[in-house]
């Protein structure tokens, strides 16, 4: 996605995901193109997953999970339906290359690999300024 125009941000994100502050790990949603969705997070000093001025691994994992949830939430709200609760079945082959510092903006692409009934298998790429930090 070349166009990084935010379509939902701030309080509007709370309509897409079940989490509530202080655990909200998505602050912007850029939309969906086919089997890809795009979201973001600006790392702030008050983030509960920040230590030593960096977002820790658990925060990146939670950001990916909430990015996937935001995709589902967007699809359901667009159809006028209630957003379902979801959960992570497993995390496989996660690679974290760098921990983003306070003030950095994460841009995350969620790709749907497979959907069977209500189970969705995804892959994710998390970037900061086009540098891959996790997948």
Name each model feature, range by range.
Residues 2-3, 70, 77, 101-104, ...:
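HotDog/MaoC-like acyl-thioester-processing domains
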Residues 4-6, 70-107:
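Hydrophobic beta-strand-centered segment that forms part of the acyl-chain substrate-binding groove
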Residues 14, 27-30, 92, 97, ...:
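Conserved positions in beta-strands of structured domains
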Residues 23-26, 88-93, 107-109, 119, ...:
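Conserved beta-strand residues within beta-sheet cores
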Residues 20-56:
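Catalytic strand-loop segment that frames the active site of acyl-thioester-processing enzymes
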Residues 10-20, 82:
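Short aromatic-glycine motifs in intrinsically disordered, low-complexity regions
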Residues 52-71, 88:
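Compact, glycine-rich, soluble single-domain proteins
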């Amino acid at each position: 996605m070349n166009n990084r125009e935010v379509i939902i941000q701030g309080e509007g994100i709370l309509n897409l995901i079940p989490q509530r502050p202080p655990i909200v790990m998505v602050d912007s949603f850029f939309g969906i193109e086919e089997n890809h969705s795009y979201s973001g997070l600006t790392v702030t000093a008050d983030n509960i997953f920040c230590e030593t001025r960096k977002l820790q691994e658990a925060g990146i994992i939670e950001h990916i999970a909430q990015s996937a949830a935001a995709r589902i939430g967007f699809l359901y709200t667009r159809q006028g339906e209630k957003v379902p609760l979801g959960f992570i079945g497993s995390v496989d082959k996660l690679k974290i290359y760098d921990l983003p510092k306070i003030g950095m903006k994460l841009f995350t692409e969620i790709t749907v690999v497979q959907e069977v009934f209500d189970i969705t298998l995804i892959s994710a790429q998390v970037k900061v300024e086009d540098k891959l930090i996790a997948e």
